[in-house]
Every structure is written in structure tokens, then in C-alpha cells.
Amino acid sequence: MADSTLHQPAYPVRFVTSAALFDGHDAAINIMRRILQSQGAEVIHLGHNRAVHEVVAAAVEEDVQGVAVSSYQGGHVEYFEYLASALRDAGAGHVRVFGGGGGVIVPEEIERLARSGVRIFSPEDGQRLGLPGMINELIQTCDVDLTGERPAVEAVLAGERTALARVITCLQQDALPAADRDALLAAARDRTVPVLGITGTGGSGKSSLTDELVRRLRTDQQDKLRVAILAVDPTRRRGGGALLGDRIRMNSLDGTHVFFRSLATRGGHELPHDIDAVIAACKAAGYDLVILETPGIGQGDAAIVDHVDVAMYVMTPEFGAASQLEKIDMLDFADVVAINKFERRGGADAVRDVSRQLLRNREAFGADPADMPVFGTSAATFNDDGVTALYQHLLELLGARGLPVDEGVLPRVQTRVSTRFAQIIPTARVRYLAEIADTVRTYHARTRDQVAAAQRVQRLELVAAELPGDAAVADLLARARAELDPENAALLARWPEVAESYRGPEQVVRVRDREIRTTLRRESLSGSSIPRVALPRFTDHGELLRFLRSENLPGHFPFTAGVFPFKRDNEDPARMFAGEGDPFRTNRRFKVLSEHSEAKRLSTAFDSVTLYGRDPDERPDIYGKVGTSGVSIATVDDMKALYDGFDLTAPTTSVSMTINGPAPTILAFFLNTAIDQALDRFRAAEGREPTADEAADLRARTLATVRGTVQADILKEDQGQNTCIFSTEFSLRMMADIQEWFVRNKVRNFYSVSISGYHIAEAGANPISQLAFTLANGFTYVEAYLARGMHIDDFAPNLSFFFSNGMDPEYSVIGRVARRIWAIALRDKYGAAERSQKLKYHVQTSGRSLHAQEMNFNDIRTTLQALIAIYDNCNSLHTNAYDEAVTTPTEDSVRRALAIQLIINREWGLAMNENPLQGSFIIDELTDLAEEAVLTEFERISERGGVLGAMETGYQRGKIQDESMLYEHRKHDGSLPIIGVNTFRNPHGEPERTLELARATEREKQSQLDRVREFQRRHRTQAQAALARLEEVARTDENIFEVLMDAARVCSLQQVTETFFTVGGQYRRNV
């Protein structure tokens, strides 16, 4: 759509954008809010997982014309109808509601929601209008003047939020009558309301610090004070749009005690032109404190000082040389300075240097620099004592200026800087990714040198054979052999024996006193003898050594071709994802999926209520999602029903659980279920209760034998998937506690984390970024666990990986590149043993490549993706069902998806061979290209302070969003051909089809509500004691998971989640 045809708004158009409750799929809404901004809208972006009441509160306080919400997790009908109703009830019925959810929202539901006043965009709308066209419709529909309906001044003075919000709109547009304006100013003058100004450099964490200060004020003063926050962000000179990105960072806005308004500068430099009148309106509305936060400023900006009573300047330790402080204008005027992100290198030096600069600026030369109002804070650290010290100092200053404060409940702190922040990665280790890149490149450089040395040795051996007894030749040969490392000489010397062991009809290996026989050849219908592992035919020793060091056979370092010598004969890699409704329905689905397989490989999808650590509830925006797009699990009893009939300790049973934020609690439910199964079997067999020693032995044996994986990858959640619920710091502590508990209890066959690239890819990343970010996250866990004092070989075998497969060429080598980098780094960088060097990974075919148009074509895409995953020796595989673009898969579509794998593994002829990619020129080329691209990305992340440092600046999220934007644009303009979507479209249109939509039934939803309430009633007394103990331990350095294992027996999921919120803090969203 050309710029000349876009609607040019006549009025300031404002939108609230978000993803729905319990929905982390924010790639689409991020694209939409970016285009809204570019077309001139002011966007208040709330991010993912937003309840209806949060969206309504934002719409009212921000006085927007429109709300745009994406919903991909089901429950959309209930959510949008509840949203429209709640807006009307809040006096904001004029706000237009827009939504989208790809093919998940079917035409009948779109029509139903239209009758409720909700405009849903379908995939067909996207094809017809394109991205700019859809956004243009939003802008055009919402280009209305809100100032025509002005509230009475009495309504503002009475504290009505809708009235205050509209008055601010009128003030910004110079549309408030002079009499009303004067009345507000007069009312403001009659009240003593201090104004706290917060300004500072961009990226210093002003919003996070503001949120932490407000949270402390509410806790300390027991919600006796009302606070109005005005957050200013700049208007873009080109286009006039603005990203108003402060509200997304706030976790302290619940209830009616805090009013929050985002303001665009609209032509002003640092502040809107009528900011004083806006502040006065907040005072007149009865608020006790006004906080004004301005955008990031340069060294010479101090405009905020003229509008506030107390001015605070926020900066970080990275200001350069101390002489740069002399150029910062605000240091002449600030009442308080906060050095945020104090945990970074140079934090203490920054506090010292700024204190000395303030002393000079104030000409207080006789004073102690330590008495200057400079605080070292870490707003990202939950309950940081440096922030508390800052809060208590500000409270004194504001109290002196009229803020009616009580004594408060927070104990006084005796520090001015953070003392308790935890360094997850020690400062000395922050360059770990650059070191790994160097390790891998050094390995390959040595390979090139050794290839040349091997070739020289071979040539000289031939010469020596032709000239026996020649001393000069013998001397040259001896020197050449000395240049060949003994390890590499041994590889070449062993090769004939290794090759011979693969040429017979079977290979016999003795393990202790057991003999393992493996058939080496399979016969085709034509009588051809197909080798399970094909061998290279190199005669040149250099090329052979290059193969052995760069690839090698499956099961041999560097494991490029696979971590095991052969695939299991009795177990396909299929691991099918299932979960819908209540535990009983999903249990039945598991039994159907596994009935024809001796190995029971169960992969569990949880509903979004569970994914966000909540219990089922009647509230419409929750109720609609119970048991939808996954199974509802709220208690250990639910978990027992889910896996009833499966022996969780059988060597042929393996359970995968895709859950992240509340993963510790779900894992505790699962392990208790496995233990209770063992105890029940003992009771049934022996007819009595086990003794204490017998029970302990059964527990230990269960933990040692249970097989499976819990995803629990919190780093990728922050970067792409968005089911983080606790603060990142607390979540990482819990991950380390789980792994430490695994080590103590000898849990060797269960993966404590599935380091996942799949969701990074689903959020929009290309295959290189998916692989680089995922491996970088894996190495971050390695460094974090080493820093906790664990030994590499105690925890590395408990790490697994999870990748997406798509249509891009790099997906053909994603597994082999990952295995090679991991093996080289673990051996040569970390000194790990062979078991730790083996990277094992699960593959799921791409959900993003499933399209609602021409859905039958989806199985073709899935088949190709499954083929390359099997060729690359993935350790397990899930093939998506063709109808997942629209609904949770039906039994029929799941059967078809499983058949894809079965046909490849059992019918496809080339699958008789287990290393079909080796020897391909293009695969070799792609492997090297992808590996180098990953190593280069490691260096980029390292430059930003490693994975955690890069996350702090939003590097990974930004890159994923950019790559998602590129894909969507190319899909919509047709330059990326997608068959049946933007090319080769059905000339007769989409055939009418009646899809079976998989949804939880009313009976299942109500049953889950009844079950969790009954569980809580039954365990009320025990739960209170268990939660108190859990909170106590979480405040110390003890292992939380040890106590959680007990608490999980008597507490529901939400009870544990809320306890962890109290002691660990909530996740703070990023734009």
C-alpha cells in the first residue's frame, strides 16, 4: 500500500496493544504496533499475557480510541466478549476493539464477535489488505476527536478516573475551556501535593526503578496514599507516531491507588507543552503524590527541574571518564542521584565519582562525599536494598514537602548501595561466548594444519617406500610425523580397524558382561545390501583426518553425524504432543497415540492457564482457556490422573512436559506421581505399607530410573516465548536448585531443562538466530551452574535441546552444527567427559509454516521437515498436524501426523541408512556456513555482556522481531512464495469445510474447577504450613526444590505461584 493512499489522521490517534491473557505469542502484535507507530499512532504497548481488567484500565487511563489484541491460545470468544462488555461498564464503550489470531479464530467465531462490536482480522483479510492496509483500517476507524465530550470539572475533583483521563486529553489538545482549566488550577493550588521528577539517560532503567519505588510506597504505607504517574516518551518527528513504552514495565498498577498516564511530547523537546496543567489536574483529582518521568536525556537537558519539587537523576555506571560528569547539567539540580544497574562492573566507582562531582557542584567542600545523596541501585533485583534505601531517602524529602506519610512497615536499611544482588554469571566469566567461538575456530584451524601434516606424512611414506634406506627421506619423514599430533595419528591408525568393524553383517560390542549385537546391513526389495552407516572412501590421509575431526561416524567425537552409533531398532523417534481438556481426556489420547508402540514416549501440552501458573477460575477471560490448547493441571491429583496406566519408571516410558514459568511446581507434581506409583505397586504386591527404609529405597530407585524432560528454559522465555512469570533472577535460581537437587538425588535419566530454540523460531527468528540464541542459552546455564559450584559432568548430561525445523536451507544442518559446537566446547573449553559432550535434541516441525489457507498442503511441508530431521539424526521428533493452524489437533489429524514419521522410518528406502547426509557437498558447505554464522552471533552477544547482558538491552527480542517483520512483509508482498497462500492459490477459492474444533467441554471445565476447590479444601491446614515453609526457605540460601517436593503434595499450582511472587517477584515485561 503506497504511503500516498494511507489515511492521514486528523486527530491524535491512540491505541492500547497487547496479547491476550495467558498468551505469550506477541510476534504478530509487535509487528502491528510498529506499523501503527509508523502510520502516526501513539501506541501504549502492554506486551503479552494481559487480563481484560488490565487492558480496560489502560484504555480508560490512557484515553485511547482503540484496543488491538492478539489471541492465539484459544478462549478468544470469551476474552473478546468480556473485553467489550468490561469497556462499556467502565464508561469506555466508545473504544473500538480489534483482534486477530490467525486461523485459530474461525469464521463463525469472527461473525459472533462482530455482533459484539469486535473487529477480528482473518488470514484472508491479511492477504486481501496486506499489513499496511489492515493498520490503515484501524487508524481510519479510530481517527475521531475525543475532546468533544468533555467531563465536568466536578467529576475530576471527585476523583473519577475516566474524567481525569479525558481532561488530560483535552489539555494536550488545547481543547479545555479556560473556565474549566482555571477551576482545576485553583483546586490544585488548594492542595499540597509534592511532585517527584525522575529523569536520566536512555536505558538507565527509569521505568523499572519507578515501578520498584511505587511498589515499596504501596507496601510501606499500606495503600493509604494515591499516586499519579505521568510517563513521557518522545514523538517521532517522521510520521508523528510514538511508542509509549513505560506502562509495560510496571507491575505495581493493580487496584485503584495508582493512576498511570503515558504522554507523547507532540512537538515538545523533552516535555509536553502543557505539562504543568496536566500535573495540576492530577493534584485536583485527589492524588497525594505525582511522579513525572521523562524520556532519556542528554548531558545538557534539565527541563524537568522547573516542574517538580524533588528531582531525581538516574544513570548507569557506564558514563565514561569521570570528567564526563562535569557536562551533565542535571547533576547541578538533582536532589537525588541513582546509579542504577549498580551490579555492573564499575558500580562502586561510579557512586564514588558521582558523589565527588555533586560535592564540587554544591561547593560543599567540607562535606564527606559519602553523605551526598547518591545511591547504588539494582531495580532488576527483587527487594534490592539499594532501591529500598533510595525509597526511604525520597520519602523523607517528599514528606518534608507535604506528602502525608506514616511510619511505614518496611524496616530501615543501613546502606546506600545494593548489597544483595546475585551475580548469576561472575564478572570474570562474562566473555564466555567469545571464548567458545575462539575454542571452536582454534579446533578447526588445528584441523587444517593437521590435514596438511597428515598429507605430508603420507606422501613421504610413499617416497620412503620407493627409496628404502634413504637417510634424508627418513629424516624428513620423522620430522613430518612429529608435526602430526599423537591423537590424530592414532585416529588414522585406528581407522582401518574401525572401518572393518562396519563392513561385516553385524557389529558385536561387549559392555561389561553383556554382548550387544547390531545388524549392519539391510536388504531392499531389489536385493541391494544397504549399509546402516555408510563409510567414506578417502584414500588421502589428510581428507580422512578432516572427516574424522570435522564429522566422524555417528557416535564418535565431534558427533556431527549423531551422538549414538546406531538408532534403536525397537523405538522410533516419534514423540507426539498431546493435551486437551481435563487430565482424563488427555490420558485417553496418550493411550491411543502409544497403543501400537512398545515405547511410550509421551509429550504433554498444558493449557495456557497452567502455563502461567494459575488455577482454573470462573472469570470469563480465564474460564475460556481452561483445558483449551492443552491439558488443565492444577494439582498433584490431576497429574496422577494424567499418567494413570503408564508405568513412569519403566525403561520404555519417557515423558516430556512443555512448561516453563511454573515448571518447578509441575515437575514436583510429576516426580511425586512417579514416586507414589512405585509405592502403590509395593502395596499391591506386598499387601502392606512399606517401612520407612523401604519407602526411601523406592523413592531413590524411582528418581534414578524415571525418564523424561521438563522444558523449564527461562532464558528463551524472556527472549521469545513469554511464559515467564517470576523475576528472571528468581527463575534462574529455581533452575539451579532443581539441577542441584537432581545431582544430590542421582536423577540421571531425566533432563532438568530442554533448552529450546523452537519457541524462538515460532516468535519469528530465522534458523541461524534460533540456533545461536539456543546454544548461547545452553552455555549460559553451564556457566551459571559452574558458578553454583556444580561439576560439569554432574549436570551436563541433564541438559537437552529442542529445535524447530522449517523450510529454510539451514534447517537441514541445524542438528549437526549444534552437536559439533557443543562437543568441541564441552571437551576443549570445559574439560567435560564424553557423555557430557553429547548434545541430544528434540525436533518439532514448524508451527509457523502451517497455514489456514489450503490446509491440506501443510502435511507436505511437515513431511519435508520431518525427513530432514530424521536424516540429521534427531533424538526425538514431533510432527505437527495439518489443522494446528486453526485448532488443537483432532484425533484424525494427529494420526496423519504420526503416519508421516512412520512412513519415513518404515517405508522410505533411504531411511535404511542412518547417515545419509554425510558426504554431500552442499551439506558440508551449509554446515560450515551455519557454524561460522553462529560463532559470529556468539561474539555479538558477548560484546553486549553475554546472554544476560544482551537480554537487558532487548537485543535478542529486537532481532527476533526484525526477522519476524521481514518474513511477514515478504509473505505479504509475495517475494517469499508460499504455495496456496500467496501463489498457486485455488482458483475456485477455499472449499467449504466443517472443521472439528478441539475445545474443552463445559463439563470438563467445571470439573476442573470443582476438583481444585475440593483439593484445596481437603489440604487447607497442611497447605498453609507448607506455603509458610516454602516462603521461609526461599528467603534463605537453602534449596527451594527440596521443600517444594513436599509442598506440591498439598498445595495447588496457583498457591505456590503466589507464594513465589511474594518472595521472588513478578516478571517485568519488555517491549
From Swiss-Prot:
* A single MF term (Gene Ontology): methylmalonyl-CoA mutase activity
One biological process term in Gene Ontology: acyl-CoA metabolic process
Record: residues binding Mg(2+) 2: 232-233, 246, 293-294
**Which of this chain's residues are annotated to bind adenosylcob(III)alamin?**
25
Report whether Ribonucleoprotein shows up as a keyword of the record: no
Domain B12-binding, chain residue ranges per copy: 12-149
Where does the chain bind Mg(2+) 1?
207, 246, 293
Cofactor(s), by name: adenosylcob(III)alamin; Mg(2+)
Q: Its domain of life? A: Bacteria
Where along this sequence does the record place binding of substrate? 566, 601, 707, 751, 800, 835, 840
Similarity comment text for this entry? Belongs to the IcmF family.
> What NCBIfam families has UniProt attached to this entry?
acid_CoA_mut_N (TIGR00641), IsobCoAmut_IcmF (NF045497)
Spell out the HAMAP family in the cross-references: IcmF
| The name this protein goes by in its record | Fused isobutyryl-CoA mutase
Q: Which organism is it from?
A: Nocardia farcinica (strain IFM 10152)
